[in-house]
């Protein structure tokens, strides 16, 4: 085992200045997908707890599909399947985007973590004590100010343990980037 580590450690950590190391690409995949997915998830979670069914149903369907299919299948759909569509080949921007394995991997990881994080944040918003919401209404807070100052800070504290587990699972999931020809830690 030590022989293997001594032989390959330089290729994992050292760079010649032109290429990123496998560790750097893995961390970049993790950070970019978690940040983009987390930002999207906050807005989707607010819509998910909405009483309006026209807002709530599409978000539920999105989370149902992305949580119900394996990440490997999602990655293959974005990497191999999307490029076979004529609209993707015909549009220059989409063609350039879906031709890159790195872009497809970031998109699949972002949407996957967004679906899981949306449900985590929606559950946290639902579990904010009713007394806090009632107090905000008594002070005359608007809905936007109530979400910004009372509900979201409290919900994010509630969601932190489950969200940290999601970040760890996303770190594990970055290993699938190798299937889309992204030279990550497994290069």
Annotate each PLM feature.
Residues 1-187:
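Transmembrane alpha-helices and adjacent helix-loop boundaries
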């Amino acid at each position: 085992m030590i022989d293997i580590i001594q032989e390959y450690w330089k290729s994992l950590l050292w760079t010649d200045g032109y290429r990123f190391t496998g560790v750097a690409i893995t961390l970049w995949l993790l950070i970019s997908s978690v940040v983009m997915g987390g930002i999207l998830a906050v807005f989707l979670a607010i819509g998910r707890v909405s009483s309006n069914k026209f807002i709530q149903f599409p978000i539920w369907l999105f989370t149902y599909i992305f949580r119900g299919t394996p990440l490997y299948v999602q990655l293959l759909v974005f990497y191999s399947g999307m490029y076979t569509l004529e609209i993707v080949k015909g549009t220059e921007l989409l063609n350039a985007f879906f031709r890159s394995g790195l872009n497809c991997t970031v998109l699949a990881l972002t949407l996957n973590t967004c679906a899981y994080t949306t449900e985590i944040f929606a559950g946290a918003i639902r579990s904010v004590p009713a007394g806090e919401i009632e107090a905000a209404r008594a002070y005359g807070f608007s809905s936007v100010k109530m979400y910004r100052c009372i509900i979201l800070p409290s919900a994010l504290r509630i969601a932190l343990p489950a969200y940290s587990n999601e970040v760890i699972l996303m770190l594990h999931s970055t290993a699938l980037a190798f299937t889309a020809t992204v030279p990550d830690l497994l290069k």
